[in-house]
């Protein structure tokens, strides 16, 4: 059984025109056509049923809000019938729930029912709220994407477009638009159409394809006459500048009225594309010139004489719209003198300072490097000194060979023979052959003019206490050490003399800067050159007849070595 709907008060909670937080409900839904029977959200009277039953019936009636709006009275009747079916089905499903909660509802423990609402008053209030919301939306300005770079209202304020003669069209268009808005907001208009915002755009009349193609070809030909590079812009005359300004997209966009803009944005562009596909083989003459013509325009001789040359940097970074007269030329004189044979006489300016002051000015003193050997020593140390003698002043005179010790220089027996025969007499003032063997070995056979110095103290006394000095700086003093094999005693004696020589002189000066070792010793020299030995014999160190002498000289050598080490230790302690 249907319960009759009662009218709801306009200020009730379920009234559509109720304002939440002071904001009116915007018009986002189409207006429903309500019947006089009642409003969809109006509740049932509380006297005939319990509050829970009333709330259930109210929810059944509200279920129709999600359905499609009716378009005629017949649709509204079917809509009410559908609501009745829904309410019956839901009542049967929830009868058990209402019976169980009857006791609590009678006790007054449920929600209060909303007050009744008048359907006609609710419909009128809802329409007024939607109309007010539509006026707010119409007054707001939305940012719409434009195809032009300048907005419509700012076109007449642009300094570039101040000389446009069609600004009146803009004013008339603005007035027309204002008239449309005033007519739309007038109170005498129908309320149903007053809230309407969006309208279907009307199609613009398309121009014929032949007319659009002709206009497109004329624009292409005009574009081909424009300068194609920065050098062409520099050579423009006054007439060319006017033509370029007319062809500028800014000027073209400013010279169009809003009505022309709308027609130009959609003035048969699709038709032009279709005609391009049909006439693809027919290329306009302007396009052929654009493809085949050179980028740089060739000037005549008369135009070249009138042209002012500018620096490359200024031409590269200059704006194309910048006039040529602003940039200064490189040369103040545009034409150089033709007669270069005759010197150009320039006037010499008189000096401001008097001659007396010029004469009193003293010349600036030049700074010279102080005389020092440090620079030379650094150069010597930085260079490869392995090919130089001990004081790094000269290279080795004799030809050297590889030996057992890499820090010493070795010579062959043939080089020794050349030295004995006097082949280096013009350079070598004196050479000393130091025989480091024991005395019984020396007496058994030795090289001619050799000196026997078996002990280190004997060598130090003979060579360093009274050093041999050359008579001239061009001459050299050479020392040659050897023993039986030139493997132990000869190299040790050579190092000892160099060590004492370094201690006795300031670095890098030496008494004997050039010293050699005879490779192979006396054992290798005697079989090859016995004529340069006296006596012509060879006595080895381990000879059975001289074992006692060998033992004595070894003890002396060890004691001398021990005394030397003790003396060195004492000297180091004294220095500390």
Curated annotation (Swiss-Prot):
CDD domains: Cdc25
Free-text description of this protein's post-translational modifications in UniProt: Phosphorylated by BRSK1 in vitro. Phosphorylated by CHEK1, which inhibits the activity of this protein. Phosphorylation at Ser-351 by AURKA might locally participate in the control of the onset of mitosis. Phosphorylation by MELK at Ser-167 promotes localization to the centrosome and the spindle poles during mitosis. Phosphorylation at Ser-321 and Ser-372 by MAPK14 is required for binding to 14-3-3 proteins.
Region feature Disordered, mapped onto this chain: 90-119, 338-358
Composition bias type Low complexity, residue spans: 90-105
Regulation: Stimulated by B-type cyclins.
Catalytic residues (positions): 483
Residues that bear Phosphoserine: 42, 167, 248, 321, 351, 372, 559
UniProt KW keywords: Cell cycle, Cell division, Cytoplasm, Cytoskeleton, Hydrolase, Mitosis, Phosphoprotein, Protein phosphatase
Pfam families cross-referenced by the UniProt entry: M-inducer_phosp (PF06617), Rhodanese (PF00581)
Enzyme Commission number(s) from the entry: 3.1.3.48
Chain ranges of the Rhodanese domain: 427-534
Gene Ontology annotations for the cellular component aspect, listed alphabetically: centrosome; cytoplasm; nucleus; spindle pole
Subcellular location: Cytoplasm, Cytoskeleton, Microtubule organizing center, Centrosome; Cytoplasm, Cytoskeleton, Spindle pole
Predominant place of localization: cytoplasm
Molecular function GO terms recorded: phosphoprotein phosphatase activity; protein kinase binding; protein tyrosine phosphatase activity
Annotated PROSITE patterns: RHODANESE_3
Tissue expression: Expressed predominantly in spleen, lung, heart, brain, intestine, and muscle.
Domain of life according to the entry: Eukaryota
GO BP term (any one): positive regulation of cytokinesis
Catalytic activity line of the entry: O-phospho-L-tyrosyl-[protein] + H2O = L-tyrosyl-[protein] + phosphate
Record function comment: Tyrosine protein phosphatase which functions as a dosage-dependent inducer of mitotic progression. Directly dephosphorylates CDK1 and stimulates its kinase activity. Required for G2/M phases of the cell cycle progression and abscission during cytokinesis in a ECT2-dependent manner. The three isoforms seem to have a different level of activity.
Subunit structure: Interacts with MAPK14 and 14-3-3 proteins.
Family, similarity comment: Belongs to the MPI phosphatase family.
Name of this protein: M-phase inducer phosphatase 2
Species this protein is from: Mus musculus (Mouse)
Lineage per the UniProt record: Eukaryota, Metazoa, Chordata, Craniata, Vertebrata
């Amino acid at each position: 059984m249907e319960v009759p709907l009662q009218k709801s008060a306009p200020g009730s909670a379920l009234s559509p025109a109720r304002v939440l937080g002071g904001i009116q409900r915007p018009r986002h839904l189409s207006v429903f056509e309500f019947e006089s029977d009642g409003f969809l959200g109006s509740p049932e009277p509380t006297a005939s049923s319990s509050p829970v039953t009333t709330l259930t019936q109210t929810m059944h009636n509200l279920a129709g809000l999600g359905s499609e709006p009716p378009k005629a009275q017949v649709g509204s009747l079917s809509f009410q019938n559908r609501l009745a079916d829904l309410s019956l089905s839901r009542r049967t499903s929830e009868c058990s729930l209402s019976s169980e909660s009857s006791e609590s509802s009678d006790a007054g423990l449920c929600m209060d029912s909303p007050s009744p609402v008048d359907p006609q008053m609710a419909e009128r209030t809802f329409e007024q709220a939607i109309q007010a919301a539509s006026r707010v939306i119409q007054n707001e300005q939305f940012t719409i994407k434009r195809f032009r770079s300048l907005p419509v209202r700012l076109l007449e304020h642009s300094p570039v477009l101040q000389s446009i003669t069609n600004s009146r069209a803009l004013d008339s268009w603005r007035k027309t638009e204002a008239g449309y808005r005033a007519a739309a907001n007038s109170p005498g208009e129908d309320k149903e159409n007053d809230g309407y915002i969006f309208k279907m755009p009307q199609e613009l009349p398309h121009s014929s394809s032949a007319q659009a193609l002709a206009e497109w070809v004329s624009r292409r030909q005009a574009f081909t006459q424009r300068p194609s590079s920065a050098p062409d812009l520099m050579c423009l005359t006054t007439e060319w500048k006017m033509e370029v300004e007319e062809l500028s997209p800014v000027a073209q966009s400013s010279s169009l009225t809003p009505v022309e803009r709308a027609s130009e944005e959609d003035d048969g562009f699709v038709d032009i594309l279709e005609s391009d596909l049909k006439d693809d083989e027919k290329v306009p003459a302007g396009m052929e010139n654009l493809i085949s013509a050179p980028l740089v325009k060739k000037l005549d001789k008369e135009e070249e004489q009138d042209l002012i040359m500018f620096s490359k940097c200024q031409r590269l970074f200059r704006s194309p719209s910048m006039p040529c007269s602003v940039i200064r030329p490189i040369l103040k004189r545009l034409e150089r003198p033709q007669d270069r044979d005759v010197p150009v006489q320039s006037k010499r300016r008189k000096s401001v300072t008097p001659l007396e002051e010029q004469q009193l000015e003293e010349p600036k003193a030049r700074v010279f490097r102080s005389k020092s050997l440090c620079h030379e020593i650094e150069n010597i140390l930085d260079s490869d000194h392995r090919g130089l003698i001990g004081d790094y002043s000269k290279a080795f005179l004799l030809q050297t060979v590889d030996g057992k010790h890499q820090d010493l220089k070795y010579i062959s027996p043939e080089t020794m023979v050349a030295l004995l025969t006097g082949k280096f007499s013009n350079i070598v003032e004196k050479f000393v052959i130091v025989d480091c063997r024991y005395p019984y070995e020396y007496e058994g056979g030795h090289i001619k003019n050799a000196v026997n110095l078996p002990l280190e103290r004997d060598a130090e006394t003979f060579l360093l206490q009274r050093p041999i000095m050359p008579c001239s700086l061009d001459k050299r003093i050479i020392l040659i050490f050897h023993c039986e094999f030139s493997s132990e005693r000869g190299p040790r004696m050579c190092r000892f003399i160099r060590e004492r020589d370094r201690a006795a002189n300031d670095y890098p000066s030496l008494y004997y800067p050039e010293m050699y070792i005879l490779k192979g010793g006396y054992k290798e020299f005697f079989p090859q050159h016995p004529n340069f030995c006296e006596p012509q014999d060879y006595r080895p160190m381990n000879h059975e007849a001289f074992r006692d002498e060998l033992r004595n000289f070894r003890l002396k050598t060890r004691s001398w070595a021990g005394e030397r080490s003790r003396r060195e230790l004492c000297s180091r302690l004294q220095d500390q």
